[in-house]
Amino acid sequence: MPQTLLPEPWMVINGNTAMEDLFGVPSRSRFLSAPGLLSKEECPLNLSGNELRSEFAESISCTEQTYGANTVSVGVDTELDLLEFGRSDFRMATSPDAVGYETDEATLHRRQKQIDYGKNTVGYQCYLQQVPKTERKSGVHPRTPNKSKKYSRRSWDMQIKLWRRDLHAWDPPSQNSFQEDHSFKQTQRLLESWLQESNSLQNPDMDWLGLQLSSLQNLGYSEDQIQNSFDWLQFRGHTNDYTYPHWIGL
C-alpha cells in the first residue's frame, strides 16, 4: 500500500487562526513557546489517513514507528534562546526607568533637602508626637512625598508645597496667635505712620499759620489784629496767581 502523505507544515500554517488551532497557544510567535512543545507529542499507532489528517491539527510530531521517519518539528526553539529571551524580559521589567524611579543624583539631592527643610519645622515635630505612624490615614494626614519616584519638576514642587501647608495645621496654637498678633501690630503701626505723613503733607500752610499766630500772641497783639492778619493771609493765598504793581510791595 502506498504510504499516506501528509501536507507540509508551511501548507497548513497560513494564518493566526491556524497557529492557534495547531499549537493551542496565542500566535505571538512559534519560537517563543515552551521548549519541546511541538516535538515530544506522539501520534496514535492505528489510525487511517483521514484520522491522521484530523489528528495533525492537534499534534505535528509523529514517532518513527508510525511514519517511518524521524520526529517532525515545526518552529522548535532551543532552550538557550528561551533563556536569553527570559533574561532580557527580566532586565526590562526590573530596570529603574521601566518602573518609574528617579536616577539623577542632583535631583535626588535637591528633593532630600526640601524634605529635610519641612521635617525641621515645629509643625512636623508636633505631628510626629500627636499622630503615631499606625494611626495615620491616607488623604487625612500629611504624607511625605516619595523622592525616589519619577516626577516632573512642577509636580514635585506642588507636592512639597501642599505637604508643608498641611504641616502648618499642626503648629502650636501659641505660635499661631503670636504670629497673627505680631503681623497685626506691624500693619497697624504702618497705617498710623502713613496717616500722620498724609495729614502733614495736606496741611503744611495751616501748620505754618498756627506757628505765626502763636508768635503774634506772644508779642502782645490784640485779637482784632490777629484776625486782620489771618484775613490778609487768606486774601494773599487767593491772589497769588495775579501780578501787582511794584510799588505795592507784594
Swiss-Prot record:
<dbReference type="GO" id="GO:0005737">
    <property type="term" value="C:cytoplasm"/>
</dbReference>
<dbReference type="GO" id="GO:0071207">
    <property type="term" value="F:histone pre-mRNA stem-loop binding"/>
</dbReference>
<dbReference type="GO" id="GO:0051028">
    <property type="term" value="P:mRNA transport"/>
</dbReference>
<dbReference type="GO" id="GO:0003729">
    <property type="term" value="F:mRNA binding"/>
</dbReference>
<dbReference type="Pfam" id="PF15247">
    <property type="entry name" value="SLBP_RNA_bind"/>
</dbReference>
<protein>
    <recommendedName>
        <fullName>Oocyte-specific histone RNA stem-loop-binding protein 2</fullName>
    </recommendedName>
</protein>
<keyword id="KW-0694">RNA-binding</keyword>
<feature type="short sequence motif" description="Nuclear localization signal NLS2">
    <location>
        <begin position="77"/>
        <end position="80"/>
    </location>
</feature>
<feature type="region of interest" description="RNA-binding">
    <location>
        <begin position="102"/>
        <end position="171"/>
    </location>
</feature>
<dbReference type="InterPro" id="IPR038294">
    <property type="entry name" value="SLBP_RNA_bind_sf"/>
</dbReference>
<dbReference type="InterPro" id="IPR029344">
    <property type="entry name" value="SLBP_RNA_bind"/>
</dbReference>
<comment type="similarity">
    <text>Belongs to the SLBP family.</text>
</comment>
<keyword id="KW-0810">Translation regulation</keyword>
<dbReference type="GO" id="GO:0071204">
    <property type="term" value="C:histone pre-mRNA 3'end processing complex"/>
</dbReference>
<feature type="short sequence motif" description="Nuclear localization signal NLS1">
    <location>
        <begin position="14"/>
        <end position="17"/>
    </location>
</feature>
<dbReference type="GO" id="GO:0006417">
    <property type="term" value="P:regulation of translation"/>
</dbReference>
<dbReference type="InterPro" id="IPR026502">
    <property type="entry name" value="SLBP1/SLBP2"/>
</dbReference>
<keyword id="KW-0963">Cytoplasm</keyword>
<comment type="function">
    <text>Binds the stem-loop structure of replication-dependent histone mRNAs. Is associated with translationally inactive histone mRNA stored in oocytes. Could be a specific translational repressor. Not involved in histone pre-mRNA processing.</text>
</comment>
<dbReference type="GO" id="GO:0006398">
    <property type="term" value="P:mRNA 3'-end processing by stem-loop binding and cleavage"/>
</dbReference>
